[in-house]
Amino acid sequence: MSETLQISRVAGTNGAPTHVTVTAQALFQILDHALRREEEQSKVIGTLVGIRSEDGSEVEVRNAYAVPHSESEQEMTIDLEYNPTMLALHRKAFPKEVIVGWYATSSELNTFSGLIHDYYTQLDGTPAIHLTVEAANLADTLLPRTYVASAVGIDPSKNSGNCVFVPISNEVKFNDSADRAALEAISSARESPERSINLTSDLANLENSLTQVLDMLERVQTYVARVISGEESSEKAQQVGKQLLSTLTLTPSLDAQNLEALFNSHLQDVLMVVYLANTVKTQLQLSAKLTTLV
């Protein structure tokens, strides 16, 4: 029989994180869990895994997985065996990641929240973070909120679950360009009645990327022209100018002829990769057909 934890309703952590970075992948996993919940469940909870900075002031949430639970007005039941089992499986693929906190798809903070937070803090002895995403109406803009807990009372060890949740700053980021491309493809499917899209080729992706770059350059050019003409003069304009100058100093200076040569070389590499991929695909298909004949 699996071991369970039953929580009955009851009435500044030093070294706690002050900033949380949430990857888009982890946020997507949380939303996927919310969409797959049972109809009678008002919210779902789960474990956040990632890495901590050396001083513990910053936490990066890289992945998340669901933890089964049931909740009523008087008690909450959590499967204690499920969490370590899932963590062991997760660390086979990501050995450097540790439990950094937990999440809930509800912004409500109550006594149960304090007790669950205390459980996650005791797992490895480091201050846990709590992330909430209001997933009741997914049509609204999603705004993740992150908290740390500050114990209340003279002796916190005797008042388990009595704490105050203190908001801390957070940001959502993409791990790499592959994450952004995948999420943009998924997001574009919502415009289709079938909720599906056809993946474009490498050349089409390259064309779309160049079009986006040209659009951004046109916006920057228009903004700079407004600043020069005096239509836009503010502290924000100075900050934008400094960022543009910093970006230009980091960009290697290339004339149009060299830039065209480099672009053509890159285009040839892309075409060669596409050609080789199609060749290997054809060879594998032919080999499979010959194998069935033999």
From Swiss-Prot:
Alphabetical GO biological process terms: formation of cytoplasmic translation initiation complex; translational initiation
GO molecular function: metallopeptidase activity; translation initiation factor activity; translation initiation factor binding
Record SMART domains: JAB_MPN (SM00232)
Subcellular location: Cytoplasm
Any one Gene Ontology cellular component term annotated for this protein: eukaryotic translation initiation factor 3 complex, eIF3m
Cross-referenced InterPro entries: eIF3f, EIF3F/CSN6-like_C, JAMM/MPN+_dom, MPN
Occurrences of domain MPN (ranges): 20-163
Key words of the record: Cytoplasm, Initiation factor, Protein biosynthesis
Top-level taxon of origin: Eukaryota
Family: Belongs to the eIF-3 subunit F family.
Function recorded in the entry: Component of the eukaryotic translation initiation factor 3 (eIF-3) complex, which is involved in protein synthesis of a specialized repertoire of mRNAs and, together with other initiation factors, stimulates binding of mRNA and methionyl-tRNAi to the 40S ribosome. The eIF-3 complex specifically targets and initiates translation of a subset of mRNAs involved in cell proliferation.
Subunit structure, as described in the record: Component of the eukaryotic translation initiation factor 3 (eIF-3) complex.
Protein's name according to its UniProt entry: Eukaryotic translation initiation factor 3 subunit F
